[in-house]
Amino acid sequence: MIALIIGILTSLIITLVGTPLLIRIVHKLNYGQYIRQDGPKSHQVKRGTPTLGGVVIVLAVVLGWCASALYRFCTTGARPTWAAILALFAMVSMGVLGFIDDFAKVRKKQNEGLTVGGKFFGQVVFATIFAVLALIVPTRSGFPVAQAGMSFIEKPFLSFEFAGRIVAIILFVIWVNFLMAAWTNAVNLSDGLDGLCAGSSMIAFVGYAIIAMWQMYHLKGQAHSGFTYAVSDPLDLGIIACCAAVACLGFLWYNCNPASIFMGDTGSLALGGLFAALSIITHTEFLAMIIGGLFVVETLSDVIQVGYFKATHKRVFKMAPIHHHFELCGWSESKVVVRFWIVELMFVITGLIIFYGNWVGLSGLWHH
């Protein structure tokens, strides 16, 4: 518990203190956000707002976990786990891609950064490294960091081992690449209104913190009753999820409307990468679609809009992603954001109810 508190406080302090420092640095460098011309006209006043705020979020999560890990090492001798290292690798690597994209935008003074091909190549490289290591690295718990299959909760409903180990690794790499691309882009799409991405991500990571901590207390070989999970080092994952949640909370202090700084692709891609990693390592890849339901809705609205327009030359929404649709319907930006937070909270509560119900069912407690 003390290790968790240390991690949370470290992450929160870093974002609360580091964000205003970054705002001043970005102001001096004149690295402001460039707003898309085809967006809502009301957003043009945001032109020049400092960006690259995701740098602080990433540092806060990494250093928060490091502080927690250092305390545990000094008090219990516990060493860093591969589960934590790979989760942070997913976050940092996607954050680096986002930083390169953001930096290119502010240097070129336009809203176009990395090419689609360049971003895709980077995602493939980092996701593949994550996937391969997650299957092959040894762990003290005896459970692999990830399992070669697709899972809703814990047990894979589709195992990739049906055709041998090599084929399983190849299929898992493809699956992880899809998840990383999907979640990084989904979270990125939600970063269109002040505070929307930070607040929604905070709620989603609280959901994963609860899931990871529950798995820790019901870990196979340690729990005395009920269904147990064969998950690698869920305590570390819970601490990282908590650090991510409070990092988003601290950043939200400066990112709420009117925003003093934007997280940029540095933040949104990093948060998406971490969310994907947590879903993979906790064996909840499909449950994640409910836990991160708001991001799924944002993505679907964009896909539907583009697909329908190409087919009929008409639009389903006034503008996509869907948060812009409600803006153009007359909702204030703050109203859209708060209501979307509420929607995300309902998704997380629903996901946790399903997660707990699954545990109760597998534990055979429905019959008592």
From Swiss-Prot:
EC class of the enzyme, as a word: transferase
Cofactor(s) needed for function: Mg(2+)
One Pfam assignment: Glycos_transf_4
Lineage top rank: taxon: Bacteria
Any one Gene Ontology cellular component term annotated for this protein: plasma membrane
Main location: membrane
UniProt record, GO biological process: cell division; cell wall organization; peptidoglycan biosynthetic process; regulation of cell shape
Gene Ontology molecular function: any one: phospho-N-acetylmuramoyl-pentapeptide-transferase activity
Signal peptide: none
Keyword Transit peptide belongs to the record: no
Pathway stated in the Swiss-Prot or TrEMBL entry: Cell wall biogenesis; peptidoglycan biosynthesis
Catalytic activity: UDP-N-acetyl-alpha-D-muramoyl-L-alanyl-gamma-D-glutamyl-meso-2,6-diaminopimeloyl-D-alanyl-D-alanine + di-trans,octa-cis-undecaprenyl phosphate = di-trans,octa-cis-undecaprenyl diphospho-N-acetyl-alpha-D-muramoyl-L-alanyl-D-glutamyl-meso-2,6-diaminopimeloyl-D-alanyl-D-alanine + UMP
Subcellular location: Cell membrane
Recorded topology in the membrane: Multi-pass membrane protein
NCBIfam families cross-referenced by the UniProt entry: mraY
Protein purpose: Catalyzes the initial step of the lipid cycle reactions in the biosynthesis of the cell wall peptidoglycan: transfers peptidoglycan precursor phospho-MurNAc-pentapeptide from UDP-MurNAc-pentapeptide onto the lipid carrier undecaprenyl phosphate, yielding undecaprenyl-pyrophosphoryl-MurNAc-pentapeptide, known as lipid I.
Name of the protein in its database record: Phospho-N-acetylmuramoyl-pentapeptide-transferase
Organism of this sequence: Bifidobacterium animalis subsp. lactis (strain AD011)
